[in-house]
């Protein structure tokens, strides 16, 4: 038996398969993969809208120039560390980036971006996401072998689409899959 070939999925999108992941946080989830190495993987769910928050209050922005609340949608990125907030955003904003991708996306997690968004000087597109998803070494590969996830290239239109409820269905359509015809029986040929 030979060694398995590692396929790096950083910058890709995971699409939860229908009828396999049937409940919980991963049901019909789309996950943007921040990092995927042989040591594990980290991603952000980007279609779990949970509420709207005031950036000024959340980040405790002390700036007298911001007089009204700056309400933004808040997404649940995964079950780990909900006290951590991230901005998944377009790469037109490049101050103090946490991660910079070559597919026109970046991730920031600092006070400066929240202030810039509040002043209208932030990125053209952004999602505020709390928490993240992580896999131990080999765990994601095992889930992929069990067909729990489909993999698609990053598509900014899906990530920043206005209607989070339709993102998953639109991703399936993009992959040429009709949920109705997706088998609840899984396996590899």
Curated annotation (Swiss-Prot):
Q: Which family does it belong to?
A: Belongs to the UPF0301 (AlgH) family.
- InterPro entries registered for this protein in UniProt: AlgH-like
- A Pfam family the protein falls into: DUF179
- Cystine crosslinks: none
Which Gene Ontology CC terms are recorded? Answer: cytosol
Species in which this protein is naturally found = Rickettsia massiliae (strain Mtu5)
**What is the name attached to this protein's record?**
UPF0301 protein RMA_0049
Q: What superkingdom does the record give?
A: Bacteria
């Amino acid at each position: 038996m030979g060694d398995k070939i590692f396929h790096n999925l950083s910058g890709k999108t995971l699409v939860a398969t229908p009828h396999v992941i049937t409940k919980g946080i991963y049901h019909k989830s789309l996950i943007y993969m921040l990092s995927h190495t042989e040591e594990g993987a980290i991603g952000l769910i980007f279609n779990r809208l949970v509420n709207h928050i005031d950036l000024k209050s959340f980040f405790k922005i002390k700036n007298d120039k911001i007089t009204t609340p700056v309400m933004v949608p808040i997404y649940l990125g995964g079950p780990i560390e909900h006290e951590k907030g991230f901005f998944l955003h377009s790469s037109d904003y490049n101050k103090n980036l946490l991660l910079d991708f070559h597919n026109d996306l970046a991730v920031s997690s600092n006070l400066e971006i929240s202030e810039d968004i509040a002043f209208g000087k932030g990125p053209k597109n952004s999602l505020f996401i709390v928490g993240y998803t992580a896999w131990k070494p080999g765990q994601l590969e095992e889930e992929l072998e069990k067909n729990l996830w489909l993999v698609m290239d990053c598509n900014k239109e899906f990530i920043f689409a206005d209607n989070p409820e339709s993102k998953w269905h639109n991703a399936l359509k993009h992959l040429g899959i009709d949920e109705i015809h997706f088998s609840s029986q899984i396996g590899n040929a």
